[in-house]
Amino acid sequence: VLFMQGGGTGQFSSTLLNMLAAHAAKHGNNSNAGACAPPVDYVVSGAWSKKAVQEARRLTSRVNVASDMISMIGDPNAEIPSPDKWQLSPVDEYPAMLYYCENETIHGFEFPEHWIQRLPQAYRERVPIVADCSSNILSRPIDVRAHGVIFFGAQKNVGPSGVTMVIVRRDLIVDPDALQASYVPPIPATLVYKNMADNGSLYNTPPTFSIYVSGIGFRKLLLDGGVPAAQERARIKSELVYKTLDVFPHVYRPTVAHPA
């Protein structure tokens, strides 16, 4: 677990660059995978994942939008398409990652629990999955082991803004300066996961107050029953909201289907 800065927007760059480095470290000597930039897959479900794609296109050449839901926004029956309908990069092209945003706060799409198990098995086993969980972290259980990277800004569910927490699988933490792959650009030092991991998140001055207050929030969460209890409280509150909206459909028109 790393404590970084730059918010979720900083991780749009950091996740991509570090995953390209991890790809080069693993596949650099493979003649099929090491000669050119690998594809990176993105699922665009709203404004935040769209911004992540825009940043990726600045930094690498093979950005594949596996599913784009932007055109569906505003349709009250819109739902997240099943992964078997996505245009994922072929596994034999060694994609560097699959990126998605767990919950789009602006446009309303939230991925269902356990959706990753619906991806093709070979894809799940070979491609690191990167999740932006900024707006629903600690609101429900998340399968950390199914992901390569999970990041979240503290300001929505954890504590004050200023700290960004990143959960990284250990085998994906590599030294980008030791690589020879031309498709890995120089990474700013404070965005390198290895720098932060090797220095206990103290590579540069950390946002101490934000970390301290977040710690208070974590302790309170545990005292109140942890994530399962928080999920149940959220369920009760959301049911009240949705039932009220159903009674007064003229007051608010949903932009996506309820399960989304």
What are these regions (language model features)?
Residues 56, 68-137:
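Active-site phosphate-binding strand-loop segment of PLP-dependent enzymes
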Residues 154-242:
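Active-site C-terminal subdomain of aminotransferase-like
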Residues 130, 144-155, 164:
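Conserved active-site segment immediately N-terminal to the catalytic lysine
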Residues 1-38, 49-53:
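Conserved beta-loop-alpha segment that forms the PLP phosphate-binding cup at the N-terminus of a helix
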Residues 16-28, 58-62, 117, 144-148, ...:
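A glycine- and small-aliphatic-rich helix-loop capping segment at beta-alpha/alpha-beta transitions
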Residues 252-260:
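Conserved PLP-binding catalytic core of the aspartate aminotransferase-like
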Residues 44-60:
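Substrate-binding/gating loop at the entrance of the active-site cleft, primarily
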